[in-house]
A protein has these predicted regions:
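Surface-exposed amphipathic alpha-helices with a cationic face
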Residues: 36, 197-205, 330, 354-355
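Catalytic domains of carbohydrate-active enzymes, especially glycoside hydrolases
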Residues: 26-51, 287-288
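Short alpha-helical segments and helix-capping/turn motifs at coil-helix boundaries
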Residues: 26-33, 195-203, 277-279, 426-430
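Structured C-terminal cap/extension of enzyme domains
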Residues: 451-510
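Conserved, well-ordered alpha-helix/loop/beta-strand core segments that scaffold catalytic motifs
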Residues: 186, 190-219
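N-terminal regions that are enriched for targeting/export leaders
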Residues: 1-13, 29
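Alpha-amylase-like alpha-glycosidases and glucanotransferases acting on alpha-linked glucans and related
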Residues: 2, 11, 55-190, 219-443, ...
């Protein structure tokens, strides 16, 4: 990240397409082309992990496995694993949202047919290599999902068989034999995910676009990690979390945020040389060029809440592993291309940790206008060079939604700060201010480029339902959007030097 650069935040699920959710298919390749035409350097996405209840990519059944919802059906058709007739069904009434319940019902039979066709042809060398190389996480994941399905998708602590809850060898061998077909299904679909994702990433990298991935700091209570490696977490004898993660109360959340994720047993991880973290980050760097770590402050100190608590007001700050973790991982992996999500309550220890690692932190422009205070560190004239600047994150409202709900004083301060003209869309005004900052890297949220309101918001923290569903349509990505993004990218010296494309000339050629 040595030069001034920019990118776009757009999750895979939000891409347009024919099958109810964005995928690794044509629309993803088209999006790379859009980034090239607008001279971007980065495509930032949310976590790619398999989602569980609530559909959040930050609550996954595995810290390593991929989300099979993103497997593209058209690619499977091209490979002869399914037919077009297999996907001729209603994938949702509204192309601007994801219907996860519908996907859960309809995707599995299609993927099962593809898996059967794949296995009927004989296991390929590429598949056998994948299974061998990824066995350390792939086998426990396949076991967990197959057994979980046999118990009606209940979390492992609710399984009625005590022997398999505790992974006793005889019980595990019996389930592996009985559920052999289900285990193979999960191995093969993870292979499909891996093949399609790496083909897409190669296309992006070949076109000088780097992928910024996202890694949640915590794992879910209902996850293979809790089942297979409980010693890495603070649990009781039954495997239930003794305490969970969250955030204390603040002006935005009077009761705090109760995430419910189990807390790590950092002493056990330290005794193991933080090997689990090295493996997790290594797996992430195989998927992404840069990794954003969510809730970075949790490595300095984290808010620990009793598992029985009804909200996050009852808790305490507990010291985290600090620099020792990153020192150990760096010794094992080398340089770490990481972005530290350092938002929220920041004290001197967190700042010192971020500076010790050298990781760039984050700045959120929407925060800068709250309180109408020119001294706010989230206003561009205070940004450090070593930072990644955003209008907002997946947890923020879109710029238009935020502006509509802001006070008259905040709107007036915002307009005056940005020297905004009446006819200038507020989303474009904030993006203009963002790209003009001294921060080495800026990331535009796709919804803001499209000037969308609160209905396109990705997530409202501490709420269930209606989150993670927004999708873009092909018609929304217009020539004027491209021209605006290209314009501010070039004007503020963020253009990718490898992309010497005149978007206007290319559009004229396409029309011919």
């Amino acid at each position: 990240m040595s030069n001034r650069e920019s990118g776009v935040l757009m999750h895979i699920s939000s891409l347009p397409g024919n099958y109810g959710i964005g995928s690794f298919g044509k629309s993803a390749y088209d999006f790379v082309d859009f980034l090239v035409r607008t001279k971007q350097t980065y495509w930032q996405i949310l976590p790619l992990g398999t989602t569980s209840y609530g559909d959040s990519p930050y609550q996954s059944f595995s810290a390593f496995a991929g989300n099979t919802n993103f497997i593209d059906f058209d690619i499977l058709i091209e490979e002869g694993l399914i037919n077009k007739e297999d996907v001729l069904t209603n994938w949702g009434e509204d192309e601007t949202t994801v219907d996860y319940a519908l996907l859960y019902e309809k995707r599995r039979p299609v993927l099962e047919k593809a898996v059967a066709a794949f296995l009927a042809k004989g296991k390929t060398p590429a598949y056998e290599k994948f299974v061998e190389e990824k066995a350390e996480w792939l086998e426990p994941f396949a076991e967990y999902m197959a057994i979980k399905e046999s118990f009606d998708m209940k979390p492992w602590t609710a399984w009625s068989d005590e022997a398999i809850k505790r992974r006793q060898p005889d019980a595990l061998a019996e389930y592996r034999t009985r559920l052999a077909d289900k285990l193979e299904y999960h191995r093969v679909t993870q292979f499909f995910f891996d093949e399609q994702w790496h083909a897409l990433k190669k296309y992006a990298n070949d076109n000088f676009i780097q992928i910024i991935g996202d890694m949640p700091i915590y794992v879910a209570a209902d996850s293979v990690e809790m089942w297979a490696t409980p010693h890495y977490f603070k649990t009781d004898e039954e495997g239930n979390p003794l305490c969970v993660a969250g955030c204390p109360a603040d002006d935005f959340s009077p009761l705090g945020q109760l995430w419910g994720n189990p807390i790590y047993n950092w002493e056990a991880m330290k005794e193991d040389g933080y090997t689990w973290w090295s493996k997790r980050l290594q797996a992430s760097f195989e998927l992404f060029d840069v990794v954003r770590i969510d809730h970075f402050r949790g490595f300095s100190a984290y808010w620990e809440i009793p598992a029985s608590a009804e909200n996050a007001t009852i808790g305490k700050w507990v010291k985290g592993p600090g620099y020792d973790l990153f020192k150990a991982v760096k010794e094992q992996l080398g340089e770490l291309p990481i972005i530290a999500e350092d938002l929220g309550f920041m004290d001197e220890d967190v700042i010192n940790l971020r500076e010790a690692t050298g990781f760039p932190g984050m700045k959120i422009l929407e925060f800068g206008f709250m309180g109408e205070n020119p001294k706010s560190g989230d206003l561009p004239h205070h940004y450090p060079v070593n930072a990644v600047a955003y209008t907002g994150t997946h947890d923020n409202d879109t710029v238009l939604g935020w502006y509509k709900s802001a006070t008259e004083e905040t709107r007036e301060f915002c307009n005056r700060y940005l020297n905004r003209r009446d006819e200038e869309p507020i989303s474009f005004a904030l993006l203009r201010g963002l790209f003009g900052s001294v921060s080495r890297m800026t990331v535009a949220t796709m919804q803001d480029l499209l000037q969308l309101d609160e209905t396109a918001r990705m997530n409202i923290p501490s709420t269930l339902g209606g989150n993670w569903v927004w999708r873009m349509t092909e018609e929304q990505l217009t020539e004027s959007v491209e021209e605006f993004l290209l314009g501010i990218t070039e004007l503020y010296d963020r253009a990718n030097p490898h992309h010497n494309v005149d978007v206007k000339e290319e559009l004229v050629e396409e029309e011919k």
